[in-house]
Regions:
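Conserved RecA-like P-loop NTPase helicase motor core
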Residues: 75-168
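Conserved C-terminal RecA-like helicase domain
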Residues: 1-114
Length: 168
């Protein structure tokens, strides 16, 4: 539901900005794990609405949303956060790889929005905040948690915000 996603996005944006400020490090990245691919697409659409379309890199796949948006900052406002949508059924393997590399190496993307992609085998040490909007258990949960626990600068561990009440 759009009102739920808007409230969730409000929280995530405020929390992530506060986290970066507290850590005094704008290179820190985050990942939002959505419940479904349609929810991830909607979250990404709402993200784009928040930060505008003044300047963006747009790739169209059968009329789907663009994968990376880079809006320009307005005078007197915080620098816009950039998001990338990475889904297994969006684009082809080479395109997804290019967006992942942009996140890892160029650090021009602040937040990755995913459903199932990148929860295992994804090594980006700057990823320090994980927002779980989908229930995970067992091996999948362990793999997701290890995404934020890579050594990076002075960080020894990452942080998880649990929106689905994972107990243990």
């Amino acid at each position: 539901h759009e009102s739920y996603l808007n409230a969730l996005l409000d929280y995530i944006i405020a929390d992530f900005r506060r986290f970066r400020k507290e850590q005094a490090d704008d290179s820190i990245g985050a990942m939002i794990v959505c419940k479904t691919n349609p929810q991830a697409r909607e979250m990404y659409r709402l993200w784009q609405e928040r930060f505008g379309f003044a300047q963006h890199i747009e790739k169209e796949w059968n009329g789907q949303l663009s994968m990376v948006a880079a809006p320009m900052a307005a005078y007197g406002h915080a620098k816009p956060l950039r998001a990338s949508l990475i889904l297994h059924d969006e684009g082809d393997k080479l395109e997804r790889k290019a967006y992942i590399e942009e996140y890892k190496k160029q650090q021009t993307v602040d937040v990755l929005i995913v459903n199932q992609m990148l929860l295992t085998g994804f090594d980006a040490p700057r990823l320090k905040k994980l927002y779980l909007g989908r229930s995970l258990d067992g091996h999948d949960l362990l793999q997701a948690l290890t995404r934020v626990n890579r050594p990076y600068k002075d960080f020894k561990y990452g942080y998880v915000v649990d929106f689905v009440d994972i107990k243990e």
